[in-house]
Amino acid sequence: MLTTQDKQNIIKENQQSEGDTGSPEVQVALLTARINDLQGHFATHKKDNHSRRGLLRLVSQRRKLLDYLHGKDVERYRALIKKLNLRR
């Protein structure tokens, strides 16, 4: 689970301007952190299908935001993919 401090650090690293919390970059970075956090949960709880459904929902939401960013600004998209080490 991400702490408030972790979220604030992620937002500061990815914000476009001061006070920016809603840009696609920030949203994708927060979703990526939550997804990575859940990956560790599934290493020990292999049969937790209820939480797995939530994980798939987060992955789908991240994919939609990345598709939006790709259509809007390809350079920002590529920079974000490289920064977060996402494959695509």
From Swiss-Prot:
Presence of the UniProt keyword Membrane in the record: no
Biased composition range(s): Polar residues: 1-20
An example Gene Ontology CC term for this record: cytosolic small ribosomal subunit
A molecular-function term among this protein's GO annotations: structural constituent of ribosome
Family matches, as Pfam families: Ribosomal_S15
Keyword Membrane belongs to the record: no
Keywords (A to Z) from UniProt: Ribonucleoprotein, Ribosomal protein, RNA-binding, rRNA-binding
Coiled-coil regions listed: none
A GO BP annotation: translation
Region: Disordered, residue numbers: 1-24
Top-rank taxon: Bacteria
Family of the protein in this entry: Belongs to the universal ribosomal protein uS15 family.
Role of this protein: One of the primary rRNA binding proteins, it binds directly to 16S rRNA where it helps nucleate assembly of the platform of the 30S subunit by binding and bridging several RNA helices of the 16S rRNA. Forms an intersubunit bridge (bridge B4) with the 23S rRNA of the 50S subunit in the ribosome.
Subunit field text: Part of the 30S ribosomal subunit. Forms a bridge to the 50S subunit in the 70S ribosome, contacting the 23S rRNA.
Protein's name in the database: Small ribosomal subunit protein uS15
Organism: Francisella philomiragia subsp. philomiragia (strain ATCC 25017 / CCUG 19701 / FSC 153 / O#319-036)
Lineage, uppermost ranks: Bacteria, Pseudomonadati, Pseudomonadota, Gammaproteobacteria, Thiotrichales
Gene (name only): rpsO
